[in-house]
Amino acid sequence: MQERMAKNVIEISRTTKETDISLKLLVYGNGNAQIQSGIGFFDHMLQSLTKHSLIDLELACKGDTFIDGHHSVEDCGIVLGQGLAQGIYPAAGIERFGNASIVMDEACVECDIDVSNRAFLVFETNAYKLPFKGRVGELDVELVEEFFRALCFNAHLSAHIVLKRGKNLHHIIEAMFKAFGVSLRRALTLNPRILTPSTKGVL
């Protein structure tokens, strides 16, 4: 267990014609974050996810935000997911499952995570009576789902993010990132009684 917690910092660089991203990640950290994505509200959300998951994350992204934020947000999800996968698997000695229901004022979001080495995302916003669109700061609301999808599919984990109620988009999105962070922290909690959290014997 101590070896897993002392695992080296993961470093990833990813450059395309659309983005240039560098990442440093420690899965079992203290919630420290240094984020520069080029999109202020997205930085705030990543800081919140980091704080509540207790990972340590340094992420810098230079992207074509003069077009829009899509490439930067999605590619940050890809790189963060890749870093998590490197830090998590093989998934031995962890709880595997984590869930949280997080409130922010009128908004309430539930998140359930399975660190299963299988990728899936359920993203449900039916409780928001209007189309889940618009902008919060410089972030297009539709990109929130794109971020979580990229993260889950590259981290090889399954997540269900469900809005239970909410009206304010800022509150809703922040509750989503907090719920994901808390759920991830709980799923990655070390348990010396669990050798491999699967009847298959390997994850």
From Swiss-Prot:
It comes from Helicobacter hepaticus (strain ATCC 51449 / 3B1). One of its GO terms (molecular function) is imidazoleglycerol-phosphate dehydratase activity. It catalyses: D-erythro-1-(imidazol-4-yl)glycerol 3-phosphate = 3-(imidazol-4-yl)-2-oxopropyl phosphate + H2O. Belongs to the imidazoleglycerol-phosphate dehydratase family. Keywords: Amino-acid biosynthesis, Cytoplasm, Histidine biosynthesis, Lyase. This is Imidazoleglycerol-phosphate dehydratase. Its EC number is 4.2.1.19. Coiled coil: none annotated. It comes from the Bacteria. Pathway: Amino-acid biosynthesis; L-histidine biosynthesis; L-histidine from 5-phospho-alpha-D-ribose 1-diphosphate: step 6/9. It is found in: Cytoplasm. PANTHER family: IMIDAZOLEGLYCEROL-PHOSPHATE DEHYDRATASE, IMIDAZOLEGLYCEROL-PHOSPHATE DEHYDRATASE HIS7. The gene is hisB. Transmembrane segments: none annotated. It is an enzyme of class 4 (lyase). One of its GO terms (biological process) is L-histidine biosynthetic process. Its main location: cytoplasm. GO terms for cellular component: cytoplasm. InterPro entries: IGPD_sf, ImidazoleglycerolP_deHydtase, ImidazoleglycerP_deHydtase_CS, Ribosomal_Su5_D2-typ_SF.
